[in-house]
Amino acid sequence: MPCTNQALPNGEGIDLVFLRDWKNLGDLLYLQSIRSGRIDENSSIAVSYRAMLSVNAQRLADFVVHTGVEFDVVAMAPSSRDDAVPYHECIMNRLCATDISERFSKSKSTQSGSSGSSQQDVVDAITYMAEGDEGVFRNLLIVDDSFASGKTIAAMLYHLRKAGLNNCSITVAVPALLRQ
C-alpha cells in the first residue's frame, strides 16, 4: 500500500494514502490533464481512466481500510469538478464514519494546485459550516482526486482548526500523487 508522510504548506504533517505517484500515473494522468485543459474527454487516456474508475476506487478504499485506522470522520475536498466523488463513495461504503463533506463548499474557482494561487487564496475560496463537534474528531480522513501542493488540505484544516479541531490524526486518500 503506497503511504507516505507529507508536509502541507502550513507545515502540518499528514499521512497520505495513494494509488500511484507521478512516475507511474498511467490512466490517472487524466486527473491532472483534465484540470489543465490539456486533454479531450474522448481521448484514449480519458476512456481508459473511466473504464478503470470503479476498480481504482475500490483499490483506494482497500488501501484506506488496510491502514488499520478507525476513522471517525471523513470529508471530501470541495471542488468545482466531481472527480473525487467515486472514490469518496466507495470509501464511505467501507467505513463506519461520519461524513462532513457537505459542511465544506468552494465559493470561487481557485486552482489550488497552480503556483498562481496563494495558500490564503485557497483558504478564502473554501467555506466551512461548523457544527460544534469538531473538537471530538480523533481520526479524520480527507478524500480528494489528487495531491499536488497540499493547499486544499491545508485550507480545509485551517477551517476545521478554527472550528475547534485538535488532537486529531489526519490522513488524506487520493488516487494520484502529483509530485515526487
Language model features with spans:
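Acidic/polar low-complexity segments with low predicted structural confidence
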Residues: A57, M76, I91-R94
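Active-site-facing substrate-recognition patch
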Residues: M1-E70, S105-V136, L178
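Substrate-recognition/cap helix-loop segment adjacent to the acidic, metal-dependent catalytic center
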Residues: D83-I100
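Short glycine-rich phosphate-binding loop at a beta-alpha junction
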Residues: V69-S80
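Gly/Ser/Thr-rich loops at beta-strand to alpha-helix junctions
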Residues: P78-V85, S149-K151
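Conserved beta-strand scaffold positions in the cores of enzyme catalytic domains, especially
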Residues: G13-L16, V74, D99-R103, V172
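Structural alpha-beta junctions
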Residues: E70, L95-S101, R161-T171
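PRPP/pyrophosphate-binding module of the type I phosphoribosyltransferase fold
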Residues: G113-Q180
